[in-house]
Amino acid sequence: NAKKVILEMADRFEKMTGRKYGFFEEYRMEDAEYAVVIIGSAAGTCKAAIDHIRHTTGKKVGLIKIRVFRPFPEEELAQALSKVKAAAIMDRSEMFAATSGPLGAEVRAAMYQAKLSAEVVNYFYGLGGRDITVEDFEQVYDNLEKMAQTHVVEGMYSYIGLRER
């Protein structure tokens, strides 16, 4: 069972270094109503946005940074998302003939299997090497709040930083 081995190794690593690892990292999720699910270094930018939003508006926003994609931690992730009203799944790549990116497909499946009712949207970012900013994440959280209030999701996915002609 790969999940068991991953957690055992994470525990050993924590005992050696004091650094905690697992399937994913949760940031300010203890009371979050709106969450971003992401993989990679853009999570640092998202953390800055979360701190700014919480400090200036008091909105309860959080982040889940995926560390292990296979085996996908569907039950654990569904538990972490069980109390949010809306979630944004951030992908850096698209999949052909699909309505989401690779991470989006996995997170949606996990939420569906757990019968979670949160509104969900998939965002594609960083295409063409473009950076994602704190302001971009602030807009994502604003959109999540609107989705949760209106129960209207304008499309299953959207693009951030895409240059239009």
Predicted regions and their residues:
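Short helix-loop-beta junction
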Residues: 8, 16, 48-63, 112-113
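A structural-propensity feature for long, helix-poor, extended segments
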Residues: 76-98
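Redox- and metal-dependent alpha/beta enzyme cores, enriched for Fe-S-associated oxidoreductases
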Residues: 31-59, 72-77
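Peripheral docking tails and interdomain loops at the edges
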Residues: 91-165
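Conformationally flexible catalytic loops at phosphate/diphosphate-handling active centers
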Residues: 1-25
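Solvent-exposed alpha-helices and their adjacent loops that cap or buttress functional pockets
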Residues: 27-31, 79-81, 112-114
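Flexible loop/turn segments at secondary-structure boundaries
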Residues: 43-46, 70-73, 95-97, 128-130
